[in-house]
Amino acid sequence: MELKQSLSVHLEAEKPLRRYGAVEETAWKAEGLGSQLDIISMAETSMMPEEIELEMAKIQRLREVLVRRESELRFMMDDIQLCKDIMNLKQELQNLVAIPEKEKTKLQKQREDELIQKIHRLVQKRDFLVDDAEVERLREQEEDKEMADFLRIKLKPLDKVTKSSASSRAEKKAEPPPSKPTVAKTGLALIKDCCGATQCNIM
């Protein structure tokens, strides 16, 4: 019994100290991480900040196009509904107008006046809707021009930076063995495929 107790005491003495928050525990964890402590960013290192910024601009542009399309569809629905309401009121008005004036009752005359006023209000509402759509269209054209200028300005320096970085990487990197050819497509090549090196096809 005394031998077992002495052995357990000896093993506990040799066991390394790993207290929560202790310096020994922190040092032990740091040694286990190894090269992982050298990681600075989890982002893809093949993309430059300029490429990331341009990609974000393209995504923002796509989002704007989707919002515009939703607005256009809402305008079309409102316009169709207004046209239906106007046509229904006109049809009812034509039926009342077809009745001779002497044969019309007081209620029919009042209804005729109400229909004329309703049709007038709906026509005005549709005119306002068309005017708003035209103003929105002009604003979108101005935004398209600004975005085209932005992409053109961003693509010029990015083209130079990509070419210089690609040439420097080609000098440092040895040629791959012929049995394992590799083809790397840079971010600029992807941008050219989408935007034609000047502006996005969406515009």
UniProtKB/Swiss-Prot annotation:
Start and end residues of each stretch annotated as Disordered: 160-186
InterPro entries linked to this entry: bMERB_dom (IPR022735), C16orf45-like (IPR040127)
bMERB domain span: 3-149
GO cellular component, one term: microtubule cytoskeleton
Transmembrane segments: none
Pfam families xrefs: bMERB_dom
Protein name stated in the entry: bMERB domain-containing protein 1
UniProt-listed GO biological process terms: cell motility involved in cerebral cortex radial glia guided migration; microtubule depolymerization; negative regulation of cell motility involved in cerebral cortex radial glia guided migration; negative regulation of microtubule depolymerization
Gene expressing this chain: Bmerb1
